[in-house]
Every structure is written in C-alpha cells, then in structure tokens.
C-alpha cells in the first residue's frame, strides 16, 4: 500500500480519512484483488489473441479493458465495504469518506471517464454508499 503526499494534502492530513483510505486498500489486499486482476487480464488477453489472431491489434485489447473495468468496479465496491466495516469497528464513522469522495469528484471535474471504461464506481455512488453506511452505524 502506497500513500502519496498528494492524497495527504487533498484530505488536509485528516487522520480519520487517511484511516478510511488505508482500510479501503486493506480490503483490496484481503480480497487479493491485484492478483485476481493480473490473472484475469492474462486469461482474457490470451483468449482475445486467439479469437482475433493478433494481440497487438487495438481490437484485441478492447475485451481486456472492458472486462477489467467491470471487475475493478466490483473490487472497489468490496473494498469500500471493507473500509466502512473497519471504520465502524474502530469506532469511526464511515461518513468521513463522504467528504473525501466529494473532494475527489471536485478534483476530477470534467475529466471523468465513461463508466464502461472507468475502473472505479462513480463518485456519486460511493458518496451514497458511505452515507448509508454511516446511517446504519448510528442505528
């Protein structure tokens, strides 16, 4: 897990948000998402090269990108759920992540990728998830 200085600046050094981000990344580690994506990309790449005949062609890379993007969004949702759970277990509100994703959305502005090729769920979806997780934690 790598934490950049840009991330720390973005959240103004807020330790609770940093804890939420680290909990999210820990979710990826626990679910072995990196290894799964590597295996999936390799398998889809081989299949695409067999079907298309030339892996170097742009056409052969399309299934790899689309397949990985869809899997990646699911992996991000699982990691978000892990983050919310770990925050609750530590006595912190998952709501700390709402402000984080609002800042991310503001930073990205007009430079967003279409959902078909985006590797992460839409910021609005993630904000809604963490708001709901915070509301459930208060019950």
Q: What spans do the regions from the language model cover?
A:
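A Zn2+-metalloprotease active-site environment signal
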Residues: 1-139
């Amino acid at each position: 897990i790598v934490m950049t200085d840009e991330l720390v600046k973005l959240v103004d050094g807020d330790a609770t948000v940093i804890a939420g981000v680290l909990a999210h990344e820990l979710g990826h580690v626990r679910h072995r998402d990196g290894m799964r994506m590597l295996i999936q990309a390799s398998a889809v790449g081989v299949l695409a090269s067999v079907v298309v005949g030339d892996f170097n062609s742009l056409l052969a890379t399309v299934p790899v990108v689309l397949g990985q993007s869809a899997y990646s969004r699911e992996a991000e949702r699982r990691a978000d759920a892990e983050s919310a759970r770990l925050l609750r277990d530590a006595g912190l509100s998952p709501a700390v992540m709402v402000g984080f994703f609002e800042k991310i959305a503001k930073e990205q502005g007009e430079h967003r990728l279409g959902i078909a090729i985006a590797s992460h769920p839409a910021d609005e979806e993630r904000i809604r998830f963490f708001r709901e997780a915070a509301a459930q934690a208060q019950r």
